[in-house]
Amino acid sequence: MSIRTPPRLLELAGRSLLRDQALAMSTLEELPTELFPPLFMEAFSRRRCEALKLMVQAWPFRRLPLRPLIKMPCLEAFQAVLDGLDALLTQGVHPRRWKLQVLDLQDVCENFWMVWSEAMARGCFLNAKRNKTPVQDCPRMRGQQPLTVFVELWLKNRTLDEYLTCLLLWVKQRKDLLHLCCKKLKILGMPFRNIRSILKMVNLDCIQEVEVNCKWVLPILTQFTPYLGHMRNLQKLVLSHMDVSRYVSPEQKKEIVTQFTTQFLKLCCLQKLSMNSVSFLEGHLDQLLSCLKTSLKVLTITNCVLLESDLKHLSQCPSISQLKTLDLSGIRLTNYSLVPLQILLEKVAATLEYLDLDDCGIIDSQVNAILPALSRCFELNTFSFCGNPISMATLENLLSHTIILKNLCVELYPAPRESYDADGTLCWSRFAQIRAELMKRVRDLRHPKRILFCTDCCPDCGNRSFYDLEADQCCC
């Protein structure tokens, strides 16, 4: 039978304080700083709204990381916090202990509450003070407003959740008294008229990461384009499932693509660009690449249709010479010359760490073109080549060229064509024999950290199975 540790005197005193309906600001003025976080959590979870209002006004830290607490269904408590902030923003004389400058609603703040909770349990507050997370400021608005509100916007439903609705309404009514700072914006499904009203409330200069994944057609993209051009500190842009409407003529398509790509001329901080299933890139990649103003660290173009001329323009783009990540998976290259890809790999050989060429349809006759350049990518730590129908001989040749890449930690290759029957079914006994042969040859050449071989996609579930050189079971 376990024996529960009795509550410490400080805990008992704090709980008694919360039960006091006549809690006064003068009482909080004398409350030890270390009691504020655990008591605030207690008040929030128990919906002690009047106590919350006063505790916000007397908060002894510059930052209030509220996001972990609003995961609890406590809209009433959340509103009480906003009411407390109202008092701070509108009253002329602030409480003596008032330090609050940042209301942090980003999804990265749980450590603050964990540290202070453990300190309360152990009675060791000195370590908690040492482990405080540094306040994240917004340099753009420093000194202009008394309060900055950090928020991450995930627009994933037709309507906003009740917390975000409550917050944005509150911000809208007090826009001259605070600064709303959004660094991460995800649009996963919402009518654009709703998105527009939210973007008008946010300082677009603050946004550093944008992800759009909601099957937009080009006419909708044109409505978003002007906002993109104002995100001058944008570092990461992810676009997925952008389609060309059948009602858009080739002339209209060219005009829309031009409007969109010219916005990149204003993005002087962009480092990561990812585009998945973006159909308007075909024949227009040069327009986008010519508007890039920075050297990219990450470039992902996946499951798109590109012309051979697009690949040529990519290999000639000056903004890709310092890439660390290159992902071209799902780009069909079967009937193309891979000389542009060879030139591209030569350009990024000094910096490239991650290369994904899955499902590009690369065949035996094409592989030799990229081998010399690939073998000079000495910083490469991950290489994936799954889904390309190559023979055993070509696979062995490929492995012999990657042998000198000493930083290579993870390698993924397709099961060679000899592993399959004429109807495309994997022959397990033959595959096991091939793996044994490959294991011997690879061990003779080097000691790889991890090599996996993958089968073709299952016609029933659509998934692949992965096997290492020795295991008989799947390594998924």
Curated annotation (Swiss-Prot):
Highest taxon, organism lineage: Eukaryota
UniProt subunit comment: Component of a CRL2 E3 ubiquitin-protein ligase complex, also named ECS (Elongin BC-CUL2/5-SOCS-box protein) complex, composed of CUL2, Elongin BC (ELOB and ELOC), RBX1 and substrate-specific adapter PRAMEF6.
Residue spans of the LRR repeats: 97-124, 179-203, 204-230, 231-266, 267-292, 293-324, 325-345, 349-376, 377-401
One MF term in the entry's GO annotations: ubiquitin-like ligase-substrate adaptor activity
GO cellular component: Cul2-RING ubiquitin ligase complex; cytoplasm
Protein function: Substrate-recognition component of a Cul2-RING (CRL2) E3 ubiquitin-protein ligase complex, which mediates ubiquitination of target proteins, leading to their degradation. The CRL2(PRAMEF6) complex mediates ubiquitination and degradation of truncated MSRB1/SEPX1 selenoproteins produced by failed UGA/Sec decoding.
Organism annotation: Homo sapiens
Pathway named in the protein's UniProt entry: Protein modification; protein ubiquitination
Keywords: Leucine-rich repeat, Repeat, Ubl conjugation pathway
Protein's GO biological process: negative regulation of apoptotic process; negative regulation of cell differentiation; negative regulation of DNA-templated transcription; positive regulation of cell population proliferation; proteasome-mediated ubiquitin-dependent protein catabolic process; protein ubiquitination
UniProt key word Repeat: yes
Disulfide partners: none
Protein family membership: Belongs to the PRAME family.
Protein name listed in UniProt: PRAME family member 6
PANTHER family: PRAME FAMILY MEMBER 11-RELATED, SIMILAR TO PREFERENTIALLY EXPRESSED ANTIGEN IN MELANOMA-LIKE 3
